[in-house]
Amino acid sequence: MKKFSISDIENLIGIKAHTIRAWEIRYNLVPPKRTPTNIRYYDEDDLKALLNIVALNENGYKISKIAGMSRERISNLVKQLKTDWNNDSVQMINLSNAAIAYDEESFSETLAGCIKEMGLTKTMDIVLFPFMKKVGMLWQTGAIDPSHEHFASNLIRDRLIVEIDKVKKPKRKDPKRFLLFLPEKEMHETGLLFARYLLKKCGHETLYLGSEIPYPDLKKVVESYSPDYGFIVLTSLNLGKDVNKVIGKVMDNLNVPLLVAGSLISEFDILVKDQLTPLKNVCDMVEFLEDL
C-alpha cells in the first residue's frame, strides 16, 4: 500500500498541512501512522477518509461534528452526496477516490452521472479538465503513481469516444476541415478528443491523427487532406518552457491557420502570430466554433 507524507496529503486534498495537524491535535481526526524510525505517514485508507471529510466539510458539515462520526458513517454520507451531479467539488472527490482505488465501476458511474445531468461540455469544463490538471501535477510531483493517471485518462478517453459516436453531425452548407493532432512529446488526448466532439456537433469535418505526430509528416498530410485549420492541444508540463517553440515548429510544417488549446496556453505567455488562435478555456473553444 502506498505511503503519503503530509505534504502529499496537502496536495491531494487541497487542505494546508497545519490545518490537517490541527484536526489531528484537536479532534484526533485521521492520526498518521509512524514508521519504526518514527516518521509520520498516511496510507490509502487515510487518504480516502480525508477526501471524504473534505467533501462533507465543503457541504456544510462542521469538522467538530465530523470528528464524532465513524469512517463508515462519513463514507455513507458522502455516498448520499454522490448523486448531486452538479456539485463539482463532490464529483472531483468521487473521481479521486475511484482513481486511487482503481475502481473502474465507480469512476465510470461518476462520469456517466455528470454527463447525463450536465452534458459533456459542462462536465469537461468544471469537473474533468480541473481533475486531470490536478492529477497531472500530482503525478509529476510523485504524490500519486503514473498508473493512477493512466487509469483515469484511459477511462475518460473511452467515454469521450462513446460520446463522439453518439453525436449526429448536423448538415451545414460550408463545413470546415480540421486536422486534429498532438505534436511530438505530447501524449494526452483528452482535450483533442473533446475538440473532435465539439467539431462534430457543429457539423465540421475532422481528420484525427492522435498523439506524437512527427513534424515532417504534417506537410504530407496537409497536401493530401487540405485542411482549413490545424488544431493541437498542449498539456504536458515538460513542454511548458518550450511551448512557443513547439507552436512555431507546428506552424512551420503546417502552413494553415492553427488553433491551440490546453492548460499550457493559459499558464504561459503565447507569442502573437498571424494565423495563430490560442483558445484558453472551454468557453473560448465553444465561442470560436459557434462564430465560424
Pin down the residues of each PLM region.
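Short Gly/charged-rich anion-binding patches and loops
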Residues: F4-S5, H18, L51, F194, ...
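C-terminal regulatory/effector modules of DNA-binding transcriptional regulators
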Residues: A143-D145, F151-L292
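Short glycine/proline-centered loop/turn elements that form peptide/ligand docking sites
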Residues: I9, K16-T19, S211-P214
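Long amphipathic alpha-helical segments
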Residues: L12, K16-K168
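A short, Lys/Arg-rich alpha-helix, primarily the initiator
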Residues: M1-E10
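Residue-level recognition of alpha-helix initiation/capping sites
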Residues: M1, G14-I15, L47, T190, ...
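Generic structural marker for isolated residues within well-ordered, non-membrane alpha-helices
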Residues: I6, I20, I247
